[in-house]
Amino acid sequence: FYFDEIHKWMLIGQYGRYIERPTFSALNPNRIQTSEYSYLIGNPMLRPTYINKFSITLVYNFRYTLTVGGNLHHDLIRQFGKEDAENSDISYVINENHNRENHWFVAITAPWQPLNWLNLNASFIGVRQDIRMYREDDYFGHFLYFANANATVLLPSDYSLEAQYNGVSRLYSGNSGIDPRHTFNLHLRKKWKDGRCVATLGVDNIFN
């Protein structure tokens, strides 16, 4: 939907319904050893995952976007870590279905060039993750975020200096979690022959 003739303001809506079937390896009930103390085991009782995805995006000047939406999962397949009943020193991973798992999100992208020699670009995604593992359970939820920021300084003689930040909150999947992660990278680039040849010198994850 366009708000004006030059399409400076636009509204874009999307909806889709999807089905994801479990892989043969996820259904295979035989154990697959992954290390001396752990193994994978399939679950032949897995059900397909049904997903309803919808979003609406406001676009300004073909560059700035604000999106809100949701991904609603029924019988989402997740991996669970468990302890072997016969030997507590051994663990295994098995796939199981979550009865419901809904992700409600807002996403923002904002490129900006305040000066001829400075380019800034930032994006942010915030997510509310609501989970009901079994039909008789109550929902429990988490807030998640993903952030990226990029600053590029154009220097004389076709040099450029680029600083990057990436941040991810603690993530949750099955009965496990992944700790938050923040990285800062710095890259110096030199171009020759109208940009056809590029050399890069950089350091990733400077503060860790």
What are these regions (language model features)?
Residues 24-32, 37-40, 70-71, 76-87, ...:
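Outer-membrane beta-barrel translocator domains and adjoining extracellular loop/strand segments
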Residues 140-208:
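Conserved C-terminal beta-signal and adjacent last beta-strands/turns
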